[in-house]
A protein has these predicted regions:
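Short, surface-exposed beta-strand segments enriched in small/polar/acidic residues
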Residues: 2-15
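Glycine- and acidic-residue-enriched helix-capping/strand-helix junction motifs
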Residues: 12-27
Length: 188
């Protein structure tokens, strides 16, 4: 399994005046990795420290590891008023069945959290006919999980006080996908 902690180094990602997306998502990625490894899944991370890794290298890491799937975590700051945005999943515009299954399994597990879910979407929030680089170039099932608005205290709980629960639910969704896809021996 390949887990992508986005941004890193001088690329901070979103910033709400207090928190950096790069830091929050590395922490979540580490927690998801630990959950998966506890279940016997081999995990490769695109970054494990606060370093910059370009998108080409991220894809190379996942593809070279022969990972069964790729999941990348992100945050948003679309609404500075703090209105909750909730969680969304993004897959390739062609809606490949394996990516749709992966994203759906994760979103189903996250259904129990106290934020809204906007389901599995294709493309990007700004352009439904354009793909995120990772979804466009991944050779395996892939999805981007957007974990809410950084200005929303409700959404922020997902990656602060509730991070362990969020990581467990995401890992459970990934495990469900891996089992359904035939990776029951805990590999990849």
């Amino acid at each position: 399994m390949c887990i992508d902690a986005p941004h890193g180094g001088s690329d901070t990602g979103q910033y709400d005046g207090t928190n950096y997306e790069k830091t929050q998502m590395l922490s979540l990625a580490d927690s998801v990795k630990n959950e998966l490894e506890s279940a016997g899944v081999t995990v490769v991370m695109t970054r494990t420290t606060d370093t910059s890794v370009d998108y080409t290298k991220r894809i190379e890491i996942c593809n070279n590891a022969k990972a069964a799937a790729l999941v990348s975590f992100h945050r948003d700051i679309t609404d500075k008023s703090g209105s909750s945005k909730g969680i969304s999943a993004w897959i390739h515009t062609s809606s490949p069945s394996n990516s749709k299954s992966l994203a759906s399994d994760i979103m189903e597990e996250l259904n129990g959290v106290d934020v809204s879910l906007s389901g599995v979407n294709t493309g990007t929030p700004d352009n439904k006919s354009k793909d995120y680089y990772l979804n466009q170039h991944s050779k395996v099932a892939s999805c981007i999980i957007e974990l809410g608005n950084m200005y929303s205290s409700k959404d922020n709980k997902l990656v602060t006080t509730d991070i362990d629960n969020t990581a467990k639910l995401i890992a459970d969704g990934i495990m469900k996908y891996l089992e359904q896809a035939g990776y029951t021996n805990g590999s990849n």
